[in-house]
């Protein structure tokens, strides 16, 4: 039996991404402007319900991350994502009902959220395991300048395959 290749190409210059090469030399993680289904499905707001053994169920990675960061663990957040999540949390913060307890989520916890969310969808797990291209989450600002986003998530995704293998064995 041959050994599973868990490598992801690490040679891409992350400061000089050519969006026309999405799906060729990288996977763009974005909800709408991506050439690949994998890039769309890995977006932080993409709906993929998953269960974390310590923290419970969430509708998306963004819901899990936001819930974790807030002081008052509002159960409604588990089922919100995208603009609805941001509006709900903004309203809570402005009214004083809630506040951020932490600014950042630890790498190991974000990795756990990503692992459990990917494993919750067998087809997504298969796509991630077969991908050899680096992941990059980015957008272009109003001046059409390249901007990276979700850097922590991108970094973790580019090194997640061994963890997925460990949990599947």
Describe every region a protein language model picked out.
Residues 2-169:
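Charged, low-complexity intrinsically disordered segments
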């Amino acid at each position: 039996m041959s050994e599973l290749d868990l490598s992801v190409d690490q040679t891409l210059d992350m400061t000089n991404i050519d969006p026309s090469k999405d799906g060729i030399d990288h996977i763009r993680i974005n909800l709408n402007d991506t050439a690949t289904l994998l890039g769309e499905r890995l977006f932080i707001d993409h709906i993929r319900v998953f269960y974390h053994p310590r923290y419970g169920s969430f509708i998306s990675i963004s819901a899990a991350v936001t819930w974790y960061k807030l002081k008052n663990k509002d159960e409604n957040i588990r089922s919100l994502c995208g603009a609805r999540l941001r509006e709900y949390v903004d309203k809570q913060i402005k009214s004083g009902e809630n506040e951020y307890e932490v600014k950042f989520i630890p790498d190991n916890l974000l990795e756990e959220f990503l692992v459990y969310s990917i494993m919750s969808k067998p087809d997504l797990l298969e796509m991630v395991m077969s991908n050899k291209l680096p992941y990059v989450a980015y957008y272009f600002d109003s001046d059409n300048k390249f901007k990276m986003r979700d850097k922590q998530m991108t970094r973790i995704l580019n090194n997640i395959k061994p963890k997925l293998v460990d949990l599947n064995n």
